[in-house]
């Protein structure tokens, strides 16, 4: 289902939920399986004509909303979340941490399935030379991603910091490939796909030890883990890696 949400911060997800739900209600198509990603998509999933419905989540949705929105919005999300999850025949997540959170807080069971990495796509990437002292951030320009922490210390680092917040996948991978370090300064996460992509391209990683990130990175073996919300430690670790 192709839906274009309103591209405005804090309106994007609600607009997607509304538009996709309307499309599902009026659609006459039927399916064997409908697979929805994250809570905003579940409303469309509910009204789809399908034999089985699968909902995958990447992080505990109510906690994500709580970090970004008002208490009222967070309370609504928490109440809605527990109801929405019951609409699916099967629930999946790509993080053991998220699976545990939902079990402990809502008593809901999820199947754990790692998100795959399509390595065939990497064959189309061109060979690019490394750029000296280049650091790259790839992700949304959003508070929970911690991009502000990197911007806070950018002028204190003798390096070129590249922010890829709205690039197509291939363009972002070229930037990653030519960089010396990938920085993932998130305040909350599930399992960032960008870490797997950096592994494949053999790019060193500095990431916060939040969410499912420690499920991928072993400190000082497969990457560097730092505490969240700590721009000082982020700067120290970047300087050490450079």
Q: Positions of the model-derived regions?
A:
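Carbohydrate-associated surface elements
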Residues: 97, 116
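Membrane-proximal helix-turn-helix segments that form the acceptor-binding/catalytic region
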Residues: 73-91
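Short His-centered aromatic/hydrophobic patch
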Residues: 36-41
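Active-site proximal beta-strand in glycosyltransferases
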Residues: 33-35, 48-65, 92
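Conserved donor-binding/catalytic core segment of Leloir-type glycosyltransferases
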Residues: 92, 129-145, 151-154
């Amino acid at each position: 289902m192709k839906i274009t949400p309103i591209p405005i911060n804090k309106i994007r997800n609600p607009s997607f939920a509304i538009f996709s739900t309307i499309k599902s209600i009026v659609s006459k198509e039927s399916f064997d399986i409908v697979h929805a990603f994250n809570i905003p998509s579940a409303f469309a999933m509910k009204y789809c004509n399908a034999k089985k419905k699968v909902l995958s989540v990447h992080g505990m949705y109510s906690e994500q909303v709580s970090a970004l929105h008002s208490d009222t919005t967070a309370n609504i999300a928490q109440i809605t979340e527990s109801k929405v999850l019951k609409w699916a025949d099967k629930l999946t997540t790509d993080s053991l941490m998220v699976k545990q959170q939902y079990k402990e807080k809502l008593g809901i069971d999820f199947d754990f399935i790692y998100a795959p990495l399509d390595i065939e796509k990497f064959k189309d990437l061109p060979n690019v030379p490394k750029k000296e002292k280049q650091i790259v951030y790839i992700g949304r320009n959003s508070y929970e991603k911690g991009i502000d922490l990197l911007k806070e210390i950018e002028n204190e680092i003798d390096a070129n910091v590249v922010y890829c917040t709205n690039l197509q996948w291939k363009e972002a991978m070229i930037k990653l490939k030519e960089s010396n370090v990938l920085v993932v300064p998130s305040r909350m996460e599930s399992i960032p796909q960008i870490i797997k992509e950096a592994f494949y391209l053999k790019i060193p990683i500095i990431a916060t030890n939040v969410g499912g990130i420690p499920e991928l990175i072993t400190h000082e073996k497969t990457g560097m883990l730092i505490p969240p919300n700590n721009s000082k430690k982020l700067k120290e670790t970047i300087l050490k890696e450079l």
